[in-house]
A protein has these predicted regions:
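Flanking scaffold residues of small Cys/His-coordinated metal-binding clusters
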Residues: 1-3, 21-22
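Short cysteine-rich clusters marking metal-coordination/redox-active sites
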Residues: 5-8, 27-30
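Short functional micro-motifs and their immediate structural scaffolds
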Residues: 12-14, 35
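Short linker/helix segments within small regulatory modules
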Residues: 16-24
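Conserved N-terminal beta-strand and adjoining loop/helix that marks the start
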Residues: 29-53
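Conserved hydrophobic "DFG−1" position in protein kinase catalytic cores
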Residues: 46-47, 54, 118, 136
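Conserved Nudix-box catalytic region and its N-terminal flanking loop in Nudix hydrolases
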Residues: 47-89
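Unchanged
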Residues: 73-158, 167-169, 175
Length: 175
């Protein structure tokens, strides 16, 4: 919860600004309106032949559960560049980013998750700081019950259900 204005240090009130319909943090001194918008999570579905690379999370939330390499987009970074960076950080891979595969609104967390299909040219991978293990799984052997997040499951199912010629991305909303 915001207590002070980042522009002038003044106190903050939470109310609906004039000509708006959503409550916002507003400075009582300089009238600056502080907009809070959803955060973007970017990730990839790294494929090597008929296998997908998953990371066993070393951090909360959902430590010790499998996930796709993904994380928050940084300022000044494009979606695909962010997906590559996250894959490098979590699995020590350099994926070739392909088509957009899934976009998921995660309303309760104020996030939008964006996943790309990614190609791995070789078997060079390892555990980054946020991973306990990194492993390739055949698409028929994905550990669905041990997956960390619904959004990762949605992206994986989109990968499984796509043909090489069908790359219309999946769009879902989670409450």
């Amino acid at each position: 919860m915001m207590k002070f204005c980042s522009q002038c240090g003044g106190s903050i009130k939470f109310e609906v600004p004039k000509d708006d319909d959503i409550p916002r943090f507003i400075c009582t001194q300089c009238d600056f309106i502080h907009y809070e918008n959803p955060r973007v999570v970017v990730g990839s579905v790294p494929i090597y032949k008929d296998q997908v690379l998953l990371c066993l999370r070393a951090i909360e939330p959902r430590s010790n559960y499998w996930t796709l390499p993904a994380g928050f987009l940084e300022n000044g970074e494009g979606l695909a560049d962010g997906a590559v960076r996250e894959a490098e950080e979590e699995a020590l891979i350099k994926p070739i980013i392909g088509p957009l595969i899934a976009v998921v609104d995660v309303i309760h967390a104020h996030q939008v998750h964006v996943f790309f299909r990614a190609h791995l040219e070789n078997l060079e991978f390892g555990t980054g700081k946020e991973s306990l293990d990194v492993k390739l799984f055949k698409l028929s052997e994905i550990p669905w019950e041990q997956m960390a997040f619904k959004t990762g499951k949605i992206a994986l199912r989109a990968q499984i259900n796509k043909s090489e010629d069908d790359w219309q991305p999946v769009y879902k909303t989670l409450p």
